[in-house]
């Protein structure tokens, strides 16, 4: 069951402030308050959906497509399209989801995490 008092629902309603990058009638993109990369943006659809499966299973394909199309536009706006980026969405407790509202993380300008081993 969807929790109307989750932090993203409050941000969408304007009850909690955020640093908005883009907003329209269906989506909101804003900076993460605890970034793990130089660019760390959260994207949320403005419909009451708990996770990815809830979003794609219970909402019109046009709403889902609009969200992902807008995600691509945000990636272009952030100028990370050519250099590489990550899109992450955790789902459920065992998937590491912390806020029970479907959202994505867009991470860019990350430091390399792999090491080259001398053999």
Name every feature range the model reports, one short phrase each.
Residues 1-119:
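HIT superfamily nucleotide-processing domains
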């Amino acid at each position: 069951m969807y929790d109307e008092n989750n932090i993203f629902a409050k941000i969408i309603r304007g009850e909690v402030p955020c640093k908005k990058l883009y907003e329209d009638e269906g989506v909101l993109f804003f900076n993460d308050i605890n970034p793990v990369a130089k660019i760390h943006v959260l994207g949320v659809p403005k419909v009451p959906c708990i996770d990815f499966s809830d979003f794609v299973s219970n909402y019109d394909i046009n709403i889902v497509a609009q969200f992902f199309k807008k995600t691509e536009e945000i990636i272009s706006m952030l100028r990370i399209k050519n250099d590489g980026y990550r899109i992450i969405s955790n789902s459920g407790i065992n998937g590491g989801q912390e806020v029970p509202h479907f959202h994505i993380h867009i991470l860019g300008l990350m430091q390399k995490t792999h090491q080259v081993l001398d053999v």
